[in-house]
C-alpha cells in the first residue's frame, strides 16, 4: 500500500495546488472533527472522521487532528495525542505505511493548534466545527467552490483507494458467510448480526453503516436495523446488507437467501443474481448511469410478467410505472470514504448538479460512468405495502395478481449488491474477485 499511497498523495498535492491557485488561497487547513456529545449528557456518539481529512490521511480514528497543505511542501499533520487515564490514549501512527508522506507535530493540548495557524484569512478551513474555525480567525470556512472541487476529485478513485475498497470486501464476505450459516441454523436476527460482526472482526461502532439483517417480511423495509432477539420459527427468507472498512474506505454488499432452495422465491433470487452479473457485464465508460437503472426497471417488468405477478406485457408494465413499486431505489451509488460517496449528482468540478428524474427520485447517481469510478450495483425486488396500496386503489389493480402477491409478501423482498470499479474496457467486479479468492463464488 505504501507505493500506492505515495502516488495517491502526489495526485492530491496537485489537486490542492490547483484549488489554492484558482481560489487565490495560500493554504488549506482540514480538521478531522471530534465526537459529538449527546444532548444534556456527558456521553458521546461514536466518532466519525471528516471524509476530507481521511482522503488525505488514511487513519479514520484520528480525532481532533489537523492537516495543513499548501500544495508544494510535504503536508503537515498535527496529531492530537493527549495524556489520558479515562480513555485509551491515541498513538500517533508514525510507523504506518503513509507516515513518510507527512511532517509530524504531536499535540498534547488541543489549544496548541492556535500557535501554528499563521495568516488564517489567507487560508480556507474544511471541517464540521465552524465555531472553532471562526475562533481561530478563519473567514473562508467550507467554501462551496472548494468543496465542489474536492468532491468531484473524490468520485474518481486512485489505485490506492481502489485497493482499500477491494481489501474491504474480504472482511465483509467472511461476515456474510457466517451470517448465512447462522440463518440456516435457525438463529435470530440478533444472533446473525453477532455472527457477522465476529467473522468480519468489527463492532457495531465501526461498521460503515448499520447492518441490515432482515428475516422474512423485514426484508421489505429497505433500511431495516431493528433486529429481533428471538428466533423466527417460520423462517422463509433472509436478506443481509452489510460491509466493512479498510483505511476508512467501505465495502457495501447485499445477499438474499431462501430457506427452501427449491422454492419459486429461490428461483427469483437466482434470476436477480443473473441480472446483476448481466448488467455489470454491460457497464461502459461514457454511458450515463440512468440508462442502466432504466434497463433494470425493464428487467423487473419482465420478472413481474414471467412470475405472473402482473398480467400485462413487460412493455406495458414498464410504461405504466408498475415496476417502480417493486424496485423503489436506485441501481446503486458511488462508493468510497462514505458509503453513499460524494458527487453522485455533480457533473463537473464547478459543482453543476443533475438531479434524478421525477420518476426515479431515489436514484443516487446521474453521472456518465468514468474510468476509476467505484460504484455499487444494487438490484432489488420487494413486496412493500406502502407502494402496493396505491396500485390496489388504481385502475391498474385489475391487471395485478393480488393473490400471488399476498403469498409472497411474507418473503419481504430480494436485494443483491456487488461493488465494481470502472476500467477502460468495462467493469471489474471487486466483490466477485474477492469471492473467487476466498473460494466462495459459483458464478
From Swiss-Prot:
Mn(2+) 1 binds at residues 252, 333, 378, 417. Binds 2 manganese ions per subunit. It comes from the Bacteria. GO terms for cellular component: cytosol. Keywords: Dipeptidase, Hydrolase, Manganese, Metal-binding, Metalloprotease, Protease. One of its GO terms (biological process) is proteolysis. The keyword Manganese applies. One of its GO terms (molecular function) is metal ion binding. Mn(2+) 2 binds at residues 241, 252, 417. Its cofactor is Mn(2+). Its EC number is 3.4.13.9. It holds the Pfam family Peptidase_M24. It catalyses: Xaa-L-Pro dipeptide + H2O = an L-alpha-amino acid + L-proline. Splits dipeptides with a prolyl residue in the C-terminal position. Belongs to the peptidase M24B family. Bacterial-type prolidase subfamily. HAMAP family: X_Pro_dipeptid. This is Xaa-Pro dipeptidase. The gene is pepQ.
